[in-house]
Amino acid sequence: MIKMTGVQKYFGDFHALTDIDLEIPRGQVVVVLGPSGSGKSTLCRTINRLETIEEGTIEIDGKVLPEEGKGLANLRADVGMVFQSFNLFPHLTIKDNVTLAPIKVRKMKKSEAEKLAMSLLERVGIANQADKYPAQLSGGQQQRVAIARALAMNPKIMLFDEPTSALDPEMVNEVLDVMASLAKEGMTMVCVTHEMGFARKAADRVLFMADGLIVEDTEPDSFFTNPKSDRAKDFLGKILAH
């Protein structure tokens, strides 16, 4: 479903991603872990070319990701993304935030899009907030709207870039619960997160990154109980000590 071959990414002289070769089959849930500056968010953002790459190729569902133009827009429509910040339109209601892309991009009828929006808001547990505006919702609720909005495009892949890092601790679980239920339903997912419990419970596979490299690529149990690299041991020692 996702294939990265020989991917290199620089920011000026800084080598952000080095020789990334990665294949993620359909339905797999991959959690990307690593210290700050390891390249995990950059990896996530290159998958739908929010970040360009200097070398290599990225394929989504067998098609090479174009550099720009309509082909890129079409492929991007198949890749949902949820960020740290919710990026909801403040002047639109929750329901209208969710219906906007299906109507504009997928050319869906308004009545159909509204029906879809309500079913997705129900799925993430906030159908009763449909007519409110983003500022009237908590951070956790807004992030769940962002997930519903991404799902409204019926994506083949969902990317999550630290979706809980801007939330108050008591709101983290409500977002992780939605992500875990998506994982159970067979959505192909790439999640950059610091939530170790989620990685253990929901991931099929853990990628550990450091210095722009994929240092470990293994099953969650193996990573948490028997990390192979010193970098991973050091990372887990710091994270799990608290």
Swiss-Prot record:
GO molecular function annotations of the record: ABC-type amino acid transporter activity; ATP binding; ATP hydrolysis activity
Binding site for ATP: 34-41
Disruption phenotype: Deletion of the gluABCD cluster almost abolishes glutamate uptake activity.
Residue ranges occupied by any ABC transporter domain in the UniProt entry: 2-236
Cross-referenced InterPro entries: AAA+_ATPase (IPR003593), ABC_ATPase_HisP-typ (IPR030679), ABC_transporter-like_ATP-bd (IPR003439), ABC_transporter-like_CS (IPR017871), MetN_ABC_transporter-like (IPR050086), P-loop_NTPase (IPR027417)
Gene Ontology cellular-component terms listed: plasma membrane
Residues spanning the signal sequence: none
Keywords from the UniProt entry: Amino-acid transport, ATP-binding, Cell membrane, Membrane, Nucleotide-binding, Translocase, Transport
Keyword Nucleotidyltransferase on entry: no
SUPFAM superfamilies named in the record: P-loop containing nucleoside triphosphate hydrolases
Pfam families linked to this entry: ABC_tran
Principal EC category: translocase
Subcellular location: Cell membrane
Catalytic activity line of the entry: a polar amino acid(out) + ATP + H2O = a polar amino acid(in) + ADP + phosphate + H(+); L-glutamate(out) + ATP + H2O = L-glutamate(in) + ADP + phosphate + H(+)
Membrane topology: Peripheral membrane protein
Enzyme Commission number(s): 7.4.2.1
Superkingdom classification of source: Bacteria
Cell membrane as UniProt keyword: yes
Quaternary data: The complex is composed of two ATP-binding proteins (GluA), two transmembrane proteins (GluC and GluD) and a solute-binding protein (GluB).
Family: Belongs to the ABC transporter superfamily.
Summary of the function given for this chain in its UniProt record: Part of the ABC transporter complex GluABCD involved in glutamate uptake. Probably responsible for energy coupling to the transport system.
Entry protein name: Glutamate transport ATP-binding protein GluA
Organism from which the protein derives: Corynebacterium glutamicum (strain ATCC 13032 / DSM 20300 / JCM 1318 / BCRC 11384 / CCUG 27702 / LMG 3730 / NBRC 12168 / NCIMB 10025 / NRRL B-2784 / 534)
